[in-house]
Amino acid sequence: MTTEFETRSDEPRLNATEIRILGSLIEKQATSPETYPLTLNALVLACNQKTSREPVMNLTQGQVGQSLRALESRGFAKLVMGSRADRWEHKVDKALELVPAQLILTGLMFLRGPQTVNELLTRSGRMHEFEDAEQVVHQLERLIARELAVLIPRQAGQREDRYTHALGDPADIEAIIAARQNPSDRGAASGVSVERIEELEARIAALEERLARLEE
């Protein structure tokens, strides 16, 4: 048995920048296959999106480039040489032996940290079709069994348990949990439903993707 935030001793830990890079590559592969693999510039924009990212980051090309080379050396990313520009793709599914459903859930947890089953079900809609929440739970349990994800018991004021990946620094995971605002509070404070917030975030993300393609 592992403690709440332990990861497998034989799995390499990923830092916050590497986690954001891999999450962004997984997302864009699913939502923008016509522009995937991504150029370095497009990947930086994807990493620094202000929607569908928790927390929002402000990474430089140098930081992303250095992290990509580290990820490549460990089998998590690959450089694809092109006639116009070099591009990058992830190898998370190969490195961790994940099926498509597990890859999408892992990518979402990379991008947004701890989430409820319903949040994962809603946010995965553009990337993978789960029939219901039970399918999400099934895949999460398979990840937990391999010590690639962890269940976070609901905190005071929360209605549901949350799940997150187990490939980062446990201290970082603890910090994210402590700082993360309860999504239900977001909606209650503004008078807007969580579903409406998710819809607006998806629209903004689509516009940011179009901008990234225009700037390539």
Curated annotation (Swiss-Prot):
Protein name in UniProt: UPF0502 protein Pfl01_3711
Family: Belongs to the UPF0502 family.
Source species of the chain: Pseudomonas fluorescens (strain Pf0-1)
Entry-linked PANTHER family: UPF0502 PROTEIN YCEH
